Amino acid sequence: MLIRTSAEIYLEEADEFLNKGGLVDVCEKYYKAAREAIILLAYKYNIHGDNIEDIVTKLAEILGDNVISYWAGASLLYTARKELDAELIKMYRQDVVELVNLANEKFNS
């Protein structure tokens, strides 16, 4: 049995907001989904750090540099949330989806 993660739930909520047009809320939800995915991966691999960027770097040593790229996209969604249009959000959404999928794959295996 697969367990739905908080990352998946945030991702679904963000997709719902995107359909309704609440772009700032969308960016925040996508960021939360990515953050939860990082937390799940850190738990899975027993990784600790002073901040989430340290954890992402340590995860990249295990899982590959894509983790850094995915996290960068998610971080951009959050830091530039008031400036992004729907098309850019959809583009960076893919980084979040990849990160959530990676976390689910590793956590549920």
For every predicted segment, state its role.
Residues V26-C27, A33:
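Solenoid-repeat scaffolds in large eukaryotic assemblies
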Residues S6, D25, L88-M91:
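Alpha-helical initiation/capping and key positions within long helical/coiled-coil segments
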Residues M1-L23:
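Charged alpha-helical initiation segments
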Residues Y10, K29-Y30:
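TPR repeat positional signature
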Residues A14, A33, L40-L41:
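Alpha-helical solenoid scaffolds that mediate protein-protein interactions
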Residues Y31-K32, T57:
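Short amphipathic alpha-helical surface patches that mediate protein-protein
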Residues I38, A42-S109:
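Long, charged low-complexity segments
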Residues M1-I3, E28, Y45-N46:
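A short, ordered amphipathic alpha-helix with a cationic face
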